[in-house]
Amino acid sequence: MSKKLYIKTYGCQMNVYDSIKMQDLLYPFGYEPTENIEEADVIILNTCHIREKAAEKTYSELGRIKKLQDTRTKQGLSSAIIVVAGCVAQAEGEEIFTRTPYVDIVVGPQSYYNLPELISKVVRHEKHLIDLDFVEEAKFDQLPEQLYPQGTSAFISVQEGCDKFCTFCVVPYTRGAEFSRNVEQVYREALKVVSSGAKEIMLLGQNVNAYHGKGPADKIFSLADLLKHLAQIPNLERLRYTTSHPIDMNNDLIKLYGTEPKLMPFLHLPVQSGSNKILKAMNRKHDREYYFDIINRLREARPDIVLSSDFIVGFPGETDEDFEDTLDLVRRVKYGQCYSFKYSPRPGTPGATRTDQIPEHIKSERLTILQQELMAQQLAFNTSCVGSTMKVLFDRNGKFDDQIIGKTPYMQSVYIQNPNKSLLGKIIDVKITKASLNSLTGEIL
């Protein structure tokens, strides 16, 4: 009888990819995935630590799992093995056992390949096992190739860690220094997902455009080199990557938007603030003028490119003038979509120790103003698409039986009413008939 594995994933696309790999890793040991936590023999929370609220969600979920465990015990059933994985695990370590002593395993992002052994030890009644080692390439060398198809759009992790040490960010402490997978590993995985039906690949990394993987004859490939190499794969229609740092947007990568049709005209390029003073305090290693130059060069290479970004409001020391600089940058760039957050002090980062923290009510006010501007831009861009014909990759069923959903080259969701589910996995010309803030509606031509 097979055992059941339940994984709940928080945070970024990298965590989604890691969860897929953990699922593939445990399958040969008899663990089949389930979406029903109540029947699980192993429960894994793959956690995010980028903001305080995200970390507290982990502990709230662990509290709910404890109640589930107590119910199973009363019913005479065995308890599930509880695993906390991901960046909360890496950041908090033994503290997790202190706060939630019923957790069995704490494992960091670089040690997932040890999960079968750790789970086996718990089965043999060992408790409070922890593995937070940084082993860099060993993670990619020892995780299995894909077992379960990812679908029409697939994630492939090519780079991990970050050397930038932005003063608000925990990633260098939870994911370690930058390292890149070798080209052959990435290419083999890309061939595998395409042969399983993927038409689109999203390359992942904490700082993916810093990619510098070893290729044939020990040549070091940049991200632009890797994208050109992957673009040669037959039946692969679309390439994307995330997340990028402006300082690593080199000329070869920018020019590729004008020469490689498989590279989609959408780029998530976080800037975080429009104030030079705050950018310096954040240790972003560039100023707003540098960012504007990157944007201008991208638009010269690919005039229809659509941009996305991340913004943090209320970083320590941010004045009204600094915030106005952020609004000015937003209005000058004109984004298609964005993510924005209030600054959240993360333990162990330089920003958390500053004495000029911004009051919560001011952060909330600024976030509301910024989000109103960003939503207006997003709606304006979506509305500008009405009446146009766009190539849509249909990748999933909708909420209703006669509805399917796809993605434009610009990462917009498109809904159509069509009972022909054979369109899934295909790129089809769609006339856009309606726009809302978060999606488009269209008709098959």
Swiss-Prot record:
Sorted alphabetically, which keywords does the UniProt record give?
A: 4Fe-4S, Cytoplasm, Iron, Iron-sulfur, Metal-binding, S-adenosyl-L-methionine, Transferase, tRNA processing
* Radical SAM core domain: residues covered: 148-380
Task: Describe how the cofactor binds.
Answer: Binds 2 [4Fe-4S] clusters. One cluster is coordinated with 3 cysteines and an exchangeable S-adenosyl-L-methionine.
Per the record, what are the reactions this protein catalyses? N(6)-dimethylallyladenosine(37) in tRNA + (sulfur carrier)-SH + AH2 + 2 S-adenosyl-L-methionine = 2-methylsulfanyl-N(6)-dimethylallyladenosine(37) in tRNA + (sulfur carrier)-H + 5'-deoxyadenosine + L-methionine + A + S-adenosyl-L-homocysteine + 2 H(+)
Limits of the MTTase N-terminal domain: 3-124
Q: According to its UniProt record, what is one Pfam family this protein matches?
A: Radical_SAM
Q: Where is the TRAM domain?
A: 383-445
Using the UniProt record, give the first listed, main subcellular location: cytoplasm
Cytoplasm listed as a keyword: yes
**Cofactor(s) essential for the protein:** [4Fe-4S] cluster
Its EC number(s) = 2.8.4.3
Molecular function, one GO term: 4 iron, 4 sulfur cluster binding
| Cellular localisation | Cytoplasm
Residues that coordinate or bind [4Fe-4S] cluster 2: 162, 166, 169
GO cellular-component terms in the record? Answer: cytosol
Q: Does the keyword field hold Hydrolase? A: no
Q: What quaternary structure, including any partners, is listed in this protein's UniProt entry?
A: Monomer.
Q: Which NCBIfam families match?
A: miaB-methiolase, MiaB/RimO family radical SAM methylthiotransferase
Q: In which family does this protein belong, per the annotation?
A: Belongs to the methylthiotransferase family. MiaB subfamily.
Q: What is its biological role? A: Catalyzes the methylthiolation of N6-(dimethylallyl)adenosine (i(6)A), leading to the formation of 2-methylthio-N6-(dimethylallyl)adenosine (ms(2)i(6)A) at position 37 in tRNAs that read codons beginning with uridine.
In Swiss-Prot or TrEMBL terms, this protein is called: tRNA-2-methylthio-N(6)-dimethylallyladenosine synthase
Q: Which source organism does the UniProt entry give?
A: Rickettsia rickettsii (strain Sheila Smith)
